[in-house]
Design a protein with these regions (language model features):
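Short, surface-exposed charged micro-motifs
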Residues: 88-90, 277, 405
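Generic serine detector
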Residues: 7-9, 25, 43, 65, ...
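Helix N-terminus capping/helix-initiation residues
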Residues: 131, 148-149, 261-266, 330, ...
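Polar low-complexity, Ser/Thr/Gly/Ala/Asp/Asn-rich disordered segments used for subunit assembly
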Residues: 1-58, 67-227, 363-365, 375-381
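Extended basic-aromatic, gly/pro-enriched interface segments that bind polyanionic ligands
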Residues: 210-339
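Structured, hydrophobic secondary-structure cores that serve as assembly/anchoring elements
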Residues: 1, 291-425
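Acidic/histidine-rich, surface-exposed loop or edge segments in extracytoplasmic proteins
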Residues: 55-66, 317-322
């Protein structure tokens, strides 16, 4: 996972970032597994061309039918036919000649597997003793993560200095991920997490999106080494050098260097990712790419917003700190602070986060309407404060600057295009 942070050519070092490693004591959540008895002879399977199986995975019942094993030669071939059903579960043949089913979800409440006899209908039930022998299968229940939580760790790590992105090697169940996301949302951090279950996009992804927890970026990736996938995703997302020109990027269609595309994706999962605000990593015509969706905001928007906030904080603090005398509580003093903000905004126009030539698409929230629209279109931003002469006496006594309000227009990013061609003979 650590090596993945530096594998892509564009990584956190490109964005002038560093890695802070903070150890903590915790256990991983585990997956539920179901393992058959040893199957030494697959000849019984070879006679099956109409196999059926009822299996409930993470609370979702699946009734498989029409399974044809006539061409199989090994136990691995049996597994291939089961895998081809594209269930949201990992299936493998073990070294002990057993078939092992592993839920892709985590934790006692979310990760479950139940195999049972199929009632009614034609076909050969693979639950039977001559096949999977479901009655003797061994189930190992999933467990929840324990120990220090990510929220507790972040509070401790902040003593070392500021950090933006957060990754954890800990495997977390949905409830813990949601708790982490809720805690991080109130802070100046971005939490990168991955779910191995594609169906979990409609559960965990929906929960995070509906709660407006957009500082949590959820990648759904069902292949092996999912933690490597999210680390690679996170380092590319953190690679923007906001001091440059045209350096802002979108995660859409980016290649995750060293990560295989998810072969289990289909149109249903694509639609689920789009609806539930998750990103996925697939392949189109042999090209591996991230497919990024905005139901929970786009990742580049969240990273740029945080970079802008921290840049404004530093710039305006520096005005106060680097002034040898004082900033007067007059219009000229307010202008000095506004000019510092404007310099930051101009840089974010240059780096591509803020766009010009665009119109404000909602009711004007403050200031002079005509000036507001003109500034947004020409500059990409509008900076406003009420005249200091109108400031309340209590604020003057507290030596507070009048509220400085900033509106800006995102530059956005084109992710797709429609083309109509008119042909005349």
């Amino acid at each position: 996972m650590g090596q993945a942070l530096f594998t892509p050519s564009f990584n956190l070092k490109t964005g002038k970032g560093q890695v802070l490693v903070v150890p903590y004591t915790a256990t991983d959540a585990t997956h539920c597994t179901l393992e058959t008895k040893a199957i030494e002879d697959v000849s019984a399977f070879k006679a099956v061309k109409d196999g059926k199986l009822t299996i409930t995975i993470d609370g979702n019942e699946h009734k498989l039918s029409g399974l044809n094993f006539e061409t199989i030669k090994t136990l691995a071939d049996v597994v291939k036919i089961l895998v081809a059903e594209n269930l949201d579960i990992d299936i493998e043949a073990t070294s002990e000649n057993k078939i092992k089913f592993t839920s892709r979800r985590l934790g006692a409440n979310d990760s479950t597997i139940l195999m049972e006899a199929t009632t009614g209908g034609a076909g050969t039930d693979l639950y039977g003793a001559n096949y999977l022998d479901g009655a003797t299968a061994t189930t190992t229940n999933a467990t929840n993560a324990t120990g220090t939580t990510l929220a507790e760790l972040v509070a401790k790590a902040e003593d070392f200095g500021y950090f933006g992105g957060i990754l954890t090697t800990q495997e977390c169940e949905n409830t813990l991920v949601k708790a982490n996301a809720t805690a991080i949302q109130a802070q100046d951090h971005i939490y990168y997490e991955v779910t191995k279950s594609l169906k979990n996009m409609a559960v965990l992804g929906e929960q995070i999106t509906q709660a407006n927890l957009n500082k949590t970026r959820l990648l759904a990736y069902s292949e092996k080494n999912e933690k490597v996938a999210i680390a690679t995703y996170a380092t590319i997302a953190s690679s923007t050098n906001y001091s440059g020109t045209d350096t802002c990027l979108t995660m859409n269609l980016k290649e995750l260097t060293g990560v295989d595309p998810d072969k289990n994706l289909n149109q249903t999962y694509y639609n689920s990712a789009k609806t539930n605000g998750c990103d996925i990593y697939g392949s189109t015509c042999g090209l591996s790419a991230v497919y990024s969706f905005g139901a929970n905001s786009y990742t580049d928007e969240v990273t740029a917003d945080l970079a802008l906030k921290k840049s404004l904080e530093v710039a305006m603090f520096n005005v106060l700190k680097q002034t040898m005398t004082k900033i007067p509580q007059t219009e000229s003093g307010v202008t000095a602070l506004k000019n510092a903000a404007i310099q930051v905004l101009q840089q974010f126009v240059r780096n591509g986060a803020i766009g010009t030539g665009l119109k404000w698409g909602s009711p004007i929230p403050f200031g002079n309407g005509e000036t507001f629209q003109d500034n947004i279109e020409k500059l990409g931003y509008y900076v406003y404060s009420e005249p200091i002469a109108n400031q309340a006496q209590s604020e003057r006594e507290a030596r507070v600057c009048p509220l400085i309000q900033i509106a800006l227009k995102r530059s956005g990013s084109i992710h797709s295009s429609d083309v109509i061609v008119y042909i005349n003979r």
